[in-house]
């Protein structure tokens, strides 16, 4: 159900949500601010080019698995844009049709935009590749750390992003180490990621994540 709140805010109310809401993207459209609104201080806007006159492709926007109702906020004056008719609820997302020129040999995410590799480590007989990643389009934005693993550096398993854009800002480049001697106190063999969070509001902040 769509609820208009003034000229520039639309609330999407979803009952018994599926795994995803598939958002239609138009490359030439201006960005809208889209947020999963659960009333938490950690709720974060994502900049997404929602389709206005045509759909170039869809991207999945993850919904919480255990919620009975969900609200997604869209901050932008979109009027009767095409996106409202083309949004879809789904438990699956098949990216196989999104890129006819997808590389076969070189690593590439299943969908979205990627840039430089970050935090390359080897742990428990697996190579971990983290990289600059925007899961909501094919242009720069919404910086996450994408995450893939491999045993031979040729065949890759794509995992959920390791670090997602948050209220501190975009997740910019950094490095990772495997703390084999528990020097930092987060556990023997913990992976420590050091990176820069960046936003207009907060500037650049040096951050640490671990797992």
Regions found by a protein language model. Give the residues of each.
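Beta-rich carbohydrate-recognition and catalytic domains
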Residues: 1-211
């Amino acid at each position: 159900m769509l609820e208009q709140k003034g000229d520039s805010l639309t609330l999407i109310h979803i009952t018994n949500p599926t795994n995803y809401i598939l958002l239609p993207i138009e490359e030439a459209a201006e960005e809208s601010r889209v947020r999963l609104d659960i009333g938490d201080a950690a709720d974060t806007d994502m900049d997404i080019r929602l389709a206005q006159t045509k759909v170039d492709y869809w991207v999945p926007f993850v919904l919480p698995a255990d919620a009975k109702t969900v609200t997604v906020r869209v901050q932008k004056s979109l009027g009767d844009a095409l996106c409202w008719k083309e949004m879809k609820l789904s438990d699956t997302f098949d990216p196989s049709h999104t890129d006819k020129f997808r590389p076969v040999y070189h690593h590439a995410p299943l969908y979205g935009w990627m840039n430089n590799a970050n935090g390359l480590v080897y742990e428990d007989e697996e190579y971990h590749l983290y990289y600059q990643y925007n899961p909501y389009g094919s242009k720069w934005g919404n910086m996450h750390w994408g995450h893939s693993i491999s045993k031979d550096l040729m065949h890759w398993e794509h995992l959920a992003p390791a670090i997602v854009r948050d209220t501190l800002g975009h997740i910019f480049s950094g490095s990772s180490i495997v703390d084999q001697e528990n020097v930092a106190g987060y556990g023997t063999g913990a992976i420590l990621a050091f990176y820069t969070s960046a936003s207009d509001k907060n500037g650049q902040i040096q951050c640490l994540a671990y797992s």
